[in-house]
From Swiss-Prot:
Additional note from the record: Present with 382 molecules/cell in log phase SD medium.
Compartments where found: Peroxisome membrane
Identification of the protein by name: Peroxisomal membrane protein PEX27
Main localisation: membrane
Role noted for this protein: Required for regulation of peroxisome size and number. Also promotes peroxisome division and biogenesis.
Keyword field contains Membrane: yes
Gene Ontology cellular component terms for the protein in this record: peroxisomal membrane; peroxisome
Record's keyword terms, sorted: Membrane, Peroxisome, Peroxisome biogenesis
Listed GO biological process terms: peroxisome fission; peroxisome organization; regulation of peroxisome size
Native source organism of the sequence: Saccharomyces cerevisiae (strain ATCC 204508 / S288c)
Length: 376
């Protein structure tokens, strides 16, 4: 029996196939792992792009906390400083205005009370106010005798003080009359040589003569009061009383005439005021059309204020004259002994003093306004 020879070439292809299969499996595994890695990377990239889209859709908010707080604090500090500075500025302006008003009123009060007329008016108001109080005390059931006697003594002293303040007006009026007479005589020699003595009566002011006689009677009453207070009683006491009653009657009559003449003067002031108001209205409408009237009517600066103050002064002067006429009628008729007449006299006299004080205050305003405009 013959044995077959061993074929060695058969086993070699089987080994190569196995090696190829193993390498193919390894390649497939590597490819699968690589492909799976690529999928995971692509998913992560897709998710990242989606998140970017979502973020892009959201509104962009820029926040800078430190800078915003700093600017807000700066704004708050700036507004606080501005408000405090405005308040302090307003306070300083208000204090300056208050000081100006105080100084202005103080100057006006000095102008009123430093004059003899202002002191006389204030003493008049005080005298008749105390007189009214003494009359009201008489109606009380419980009478204060000591207080009433002291009150009457104060009233007498105030009346005497008023006579002291008016003392010397007769000499001033007499000097004015003599000066006026000399001026008229010189005018007659220069321009009116052919005129008669009636020239003096036409151009002489009747008010000055009446005022001079009134001041003369006023000073005679003062001398009589001083004599009765400090002098000794003599045998001619009855004759002096008769003479002084006559002087007092003439004193009241002359005061009534002066008030009537003052009404005439007040009417002339009203006419002049109306002219000035018309002139001012024309001047405000057409200033170029009144150049020919500037020499005839001269108004000071700050015309509206001055005209208003002048109007108030003329009105107060008119009220004062009316009250003086009413109070003096009670003196002329001699009815001050009655209670009602005396009460009316005291009330009217207080009203007259108040109106005269207001007139002096307005006059002080006019002078201060004129000084201010002249300074400007």
């Amino acid at each position: 029996m013959t044995s077959d020879p061993v074929n060695t070439n058969i086993s070699s292809p089987t080994l190569t196939d196995r090696n190829a299969d193993e390498s193919w499996e390894l390649l497939k595994r590597e490819f699968n792992t690589l492909f799976s890695n690529l999928k995971t990377d692509s998913k992560e990239e897709g998710n990242f792009t989606d998140n970017k889209g979502v973020i892009a859709k959201k509104p962009i908010v820029l926040q800078d906390n430190d800078d915003s707080d700093f600017t807000q604090n700066q704004g708050k500090v700036a507004t606080a400083t501005s408000t405090t500075s405005d308040r302090s500025f307003k306070r300083t302006l208000g204090s300056i205005e208050m000081k100006k008003r105080y100084v202005k009123k103080n100057c006006q009060a000095k102008f009123v009370f430093n004059t003899l007329e202002g002191k006389e008016v204030c003493s008049k108001i005080l005298q008749h106010t105390l007189g009214l109080l003494s009359l009201l005390l008489l109606t009380r059931k419980i009478r204060l005798l000591n207080f009433s006697s002291k009150l009457r003594l104060v009233i007498q002293q105030l009346s005497l003080f008023r006579y002291y303040l008016r003392f010397g007006n007769f000499a001033i009026n007499l000097y004015k009359i003599i000066k006026r007479f000399r001026w008229l005589r010189e005018m007659k020699k220069l321009h009116y040589k052919d005129q008669s003595i009636l020239f003096y009566f036409k151009n002489f002011r009747f008010f000055d003569i009446i005022e001079a006689f009134y001041n003369l009677t006023d000073e005679l009453i003062l001398f009589h009061k001083l004599q009765s207070m400090f002098g000794k009683k003599n045998t001619s006491h009855a004759n002096t009383n008769r003479l002084m009653t006559f002087v007092k009657e003439q004193h009241y009559i002359l005061w009534e005439v002066l008030n009537i003449l003052a009404i005439n003067k007040n009417i002339e002031q009203w006419r002049q005021l109306i002219r000035d108001e018309i002139y001012l209205s024309i001047y405000n409408t057409s200033g170029n059309a009144i150049k020919e009237y500037e020499l005839k009517y001269k108004l000071p600066t700050n015309d509206k204020v001055n005209l208003e103050l002048r109007k108030n002064n003329i009105t107060l002067d008119f009220y004062k004259i009316i009250l003086n006429l009413l109070s003096n009628l009670i003196n002329i008729k001699g009815k001050r002994d009655k209670y009602n007449s005396e009460l009316a006299y005291e009330i009217i006299s207080v009203g007259s003093g108040v109106t005269e004080l207001l007139k002096l205050w307005n006059r002080a305003k006019v002078t201060s306004a004129n000084e201010h405009t002249s300074a400007v």
